[in-house]
């Protein structure tokens, strides 16, 4: 279960609220990935589907799953699940 968000935009997408500056189709893709993240019981669950391109970010203690080639969802992992969840333009 998602524990916390790093910004308001990510939380709005999770709640199904429209975010003007992000295209609707990209918001739908992000919500799909957030749903995968919310359902994960352990980090290993995020290796599927392979399109998540799940990996640890070097030296940060954060992890990443891909939404598309430009956008990612990054987060930390706690005993209770993902925290500090952030939908971000990674480039």
What are these regions (language model features)?
Residues 1, 9, 18, 42, ...:
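Glycine-rich, flexible loop/turn motifs
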Residues 1-34:
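Arg/Lys-rich, positively charged N-terminal/basic patches that mediate binding to nucleic acids
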Residues 24-51:
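Compact soluble domain cores
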Residues 54-58, 62-91:
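Enriched for short, Lys/Arg-rich terminal
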